[in-house]
Regions:
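Repeated loop/turn-to-beta-strand initiation elements of outer-membrane beta-barrel proteins
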Residues: 1, 99-104, 129-136, 163-169
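Outer-membrane beta-barrel domain signature
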Residues: 65, 76-82, 109-115, 141-146
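Outer-membrane beta-barrel translocator/channel fold
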Residues: 11-38, 45-46, 138-153, 168-185
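Residues that cap or anchor secondary-structure elements
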Residues: 9-83, 88-90, 95, 106
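Residues that define the transmembrane beta-barrel architecture of outer-membrane proteins
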Residues: 85-89, 96, 116-121, 149-153, ...
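Membrane-embedded beta-strands of outer-membrane beta-barrel proteins
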Residues: 1, 91, 123-125, 155, ...
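Transmembrane beta-strands of outer-membrane beta-barrel pores
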Residues: 5-11, 97-99, 106-112, 129, ...
Length: 186
């Protein structure tokens, strides 16, 4: 069990500068040890550029809706935005056995002067039998300032019947507020 309350999760290394004009978002790996060490259980088996969890968003830029305030407060809100949220707590638990793995990741951001922190939760279950691994990953994010919740449920499998043949796939269902999205990778 790894837990941290009101941690200083400052970035330990800076990111390389990348100029990206494509429609695909540039993925930066998380370099904060709490979120990068022993995080393999939360990775899903799929083709490249598929990440169900992006821990870099935890402690990222706060959501603001300055229009909710009166004129003077709106100016204060606009002029006092911060670039990153403090994290009140983060908890990660993982248990890996011979045939079943389980993990939980939760984090809650601190409230700022003109913003409420976001909440992030994820659970992972993975089982192995012979040449087959099957897993489930569920995530939930609450962003109260913009009145938005997001849920992702995914099932993944990895089948290795021989040293030269490997099949893997991923089914994903997402729900952002009341809008559904689906994904499949094989």
């Amino acid at each position: 069990l790894n837990a941290a309350f009101n941690p200083d999760f400052g970035q330990v290394e800076s990111d390389d500068v990348v100029v990206n004009f494509s429609a695909t978002e540039t993925f930066y790996s998380d370099k904060r040890p709490f979120f990068s060490e022993n995080h393999g259980l939360f990775n899903v088996t799929a083709w490249r550029f598929l990440y169900v969890i992006n821990t870099r968003r935890i402690g990222g830029e706060p959501d603001y809706d300055c229009s909710k305030f009166e004129a003077l407060q709106q100016d204060n809100c606009l002029n006092n935005k911060v670039g990153a949220n403090d994290i009140d707590y983060a908890v990660r638990y993982s248990q890996q056995e011979e045939s079943v793995d389980f993990g939980f990741l939760g984090a809650s951001e601190a409230d700022e002067n003109f913003s409420q922190g976001k909440d992030f939760y994820s659970v992972r279950l993975r089982t192995r039998k012979d040449d087959l691994t099957v897993g489930y990953l569920g995530t939930y994010v609450n962003r109260p300032v913009i009145d938005r919740t997001a849920q992702v449920n995914s099932m993944d499998f990895d089948y290795r019947p021989s040293s030269v043949l490997r099949l893997n796939g991923l089914l994903v269902h997402s729900k952002v507020n009341d809008k559904d999205g689906y994904g499949f990778d094989f």
